[in-house]
């Protein structure tokens, strides 16, 4: 699934030279910032490495940015890889043996590490030692390599898929949450200054309200609306041009797009609001289950349009109202599910 509202990274997102370098520049996640500042100062005062850190939560909220900030704050080199890229234990050993003291090793999608790689990582995280086998067959022998004191930072959108032994080795687990409108406005205002964009307060608010609580999406929308403004001959990005551009991008007033409507209407039209299993939804929409669970559902659940129940997904009365569809005649049991927590 590729669309303007996807919180996943794209190569074009990296073109924006606006990533903050230090905690004081990072907008949002206030409690995380304050706690990180304490942990970093304490580690530096003791002349120790920062404890291994795990960032988890929906995509697009700043996990990679915070990892780079930590590297800058502690004065180490930043080395980055991803769980799927580390196929063999030897791949991990090669990375670890090239680290220096106070380096930060960032592993994105850490929940996708395979078991053999994880087992090598345990002793590296806990004892800063690497146990590897050199040679083959009868000539094989174990070798223990001492590693420098480094900080491992893991990032995941699927916290529940990380094994307990690996999860327990992170001294600093931190959940990143969706941003509110005011925080997203701050992100947009900072970006507009760095990019020399004349963005009005009403313009930043309009983009923020439709950005699904996600900075990555907000910045992507800002860049696309700038395109509409340039072609339309406007030097200032205000609410009017934002509304025009967002409608052209099929982003509605609360940040839903055609993929969200497909999801909601499938459940509404075919299952009278649900419940319906996620595998059925994925098959009907020709989407991967992971894509639905990581890209579409988190925001729909956050704003109260979808609920996950033991029997499957259910869209709420608020969803029917937003779709401007009549609420179906359902059994009292089904209505109880729809009305739950409304």
From Swiss-Prot:
Its EC number is 3.6.4.-. Residues 1-179 are annotated as: Large ATPase domain (RuvB-L). DNA binds at residues 289, 308, 313. GO terms for molecular function: ATP binding; ATP hydrolysis activity; four-way junction DNA binding; four-way junction helicase activity. Gene3D superfamilies: 1.10.8.60, P-loop containing nucleotide triphosphate hydrolases, Winged helix-like DNA-binding domain superfamily/Winged helix DNA-binding domain. The keyword DNA-binding applies. It catalyses: ATP + H2O = ADP + phosphate + H(+). SUPFAM superfamilies: P-loop containing nucleoside triphosphate hydrolases, Winged helix' DNA-binding domain. Its main location: cytoplasm. ATP binds at residues 18-19, 60, 63-65, 126-128, 169, 179, 216. GO terms for biological process: DNA recombination; DNA repair. It is found in: Cytoplasm. Keywords: ATP-binding, Cytoplasm, DNA damage, DNA recombination, DNA repair, DNA-binding, Hydrolase, Nucleotide-binding. Mg(2+) binds at residue 64. Residues 180-250 are annotated as: Small ATPAse domain (RuvB-S). The keyword Plastid does not apply. Homohexamer. Forms an RuvA(8)-RuvB(12)-Holliday junction (HJ) complex. HJ DNA is sandwiched between 2 RuvA tetramers; dsDNA enters through RuvA and exits via RuvB. An RuvB hexamer assembles on each DNA strand where it exits the tetramer. Each RuvB hexamer is contacted by two RuvA subunits (via domain III) on 2 adjacent RuvB subunits; this complex drives branch migration. In the full resolvosome a probable DNA-RuvA(4)-RuvB(12)-RuvC(2) complex forms which resolves the HJ. Belongs to the RuvB family. This is Holliday junction branch migration complex subunit RuvB. The gene is ruvB.
């Amino acid at each position: 699934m590729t669309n303007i509202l996807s919180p996943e990274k794209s190569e074009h997102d990296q073109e924006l030279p606006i990533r903050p370098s230090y905690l004081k520049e990072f907008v949002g996640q206030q409690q995380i910032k304050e706690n990180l500042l304490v942990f970093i100062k304490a580690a530096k005062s003791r002349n120790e490495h920062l404890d291994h850190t795990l960032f988890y939560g929906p995509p697009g909220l700043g996990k990679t940015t915070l990892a780079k900030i930590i590297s800058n704050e502690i004065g180490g080199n930043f080395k980055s890889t991803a769980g799927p890229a580390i196929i063999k234990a030897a791949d991990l050993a090669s990375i670890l043996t090239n680290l220096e003291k106070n380096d930060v090793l960032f592993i994105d999608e850490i929940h996708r590490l395979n078991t053999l790689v994880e087992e090598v990582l345990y002793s590296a995280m806990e004892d800063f030692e690497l146990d590897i086998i050199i040679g083959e067959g009868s000539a094989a022998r174990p070798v223990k390599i001492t590693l420098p004191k480094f900080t491992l930072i893991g990032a995941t959108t699927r916290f529940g898929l990380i094994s307990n032994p690996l999860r327990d080795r992170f001294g600093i687990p931190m959940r990143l949450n969706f941003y509110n409108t005011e925080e997203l406005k701050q992100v947009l205002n900072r970006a507009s200054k760095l990019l020399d964009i004349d963005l009005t307060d009403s313009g930043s608010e309009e983009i923020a309200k439709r950005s699904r609580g996600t900075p990555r999406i907000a910045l992507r929308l800002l860049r696309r609306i700038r395109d509409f403004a340039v072609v339309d001959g406007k030097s200032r990005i205000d609410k009017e041009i934002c509304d025009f551009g967002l409608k052209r991008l099929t982003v509605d007033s609360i940040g839903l797009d055609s993929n969200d409507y497909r999801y909601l209407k499938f459940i509404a039209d075919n299952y009278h609001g649900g419940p319906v299993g996620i595998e059925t939804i994925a098959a009907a929409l020709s989407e991967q289950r992971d894509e639905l669970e990581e890209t579409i559902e988190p925001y729909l659940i956050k704003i109260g349009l979808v609920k996950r129940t033991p029997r499957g997904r259910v869209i709420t009365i608020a969803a029917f109202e937003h779709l401007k569809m009549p609420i179906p005649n359902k059994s009292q049991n089904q209505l109880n599910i729809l009305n739950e927590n409304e």
